[in-house]
């Protein structure tokens, strides 16, 4: 199977779109960062380093300090595909992030986005 082009895209090139999507719906950059931190384990400083280095998506997730074990609770459809059915691990992580940002932009409460019971 051919390598998907998003793997080689820099996280820094997509990050502003995540922030813009959230801010357009009245949410904040801090909330986007909180979601990314929850999913990947990057703290604010580490996240900024990844952005500054223009790390590609594949490396961004491969180097993630602590992928959250609760991320498997993320369910739903992104780009017409159920995230829980994506077999390729890196693509699944990317779509998890897309799904969380979508939920933020739709106004879902942060506790529900972060799968807190």
What are these regions (language model features)?
Residues 1-117:
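A charge-rich, low-complexity, intrinsically flexible signal that marks solvent-exposed coils, linkers
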């Amino acid at each position: 199977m051919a390598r998907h082009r998003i793997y080689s895209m820099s996280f820094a090139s997509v990050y502003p779109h995540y922030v813009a999507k959230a801010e357009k719906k009245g949410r904040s950059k801090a909330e986007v960062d909180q979601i990314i931190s929850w999913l990947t384990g990057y703290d604010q400083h580490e996240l900024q380093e990844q952005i500054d280095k223009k790390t590609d998506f594949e490396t961004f997730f491969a180097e993630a300090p602590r992928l959250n074990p609760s991320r498997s609770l993320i369910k739903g459809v992104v780009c017409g595909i159920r995230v829980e059915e994506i077999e390729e691990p890196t693509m699944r992580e990317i779509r998890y992030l897309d799904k969380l940002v979508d939920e933020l932009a739709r106004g879902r409460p942060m506790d529900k986005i972060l799968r807190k019971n």
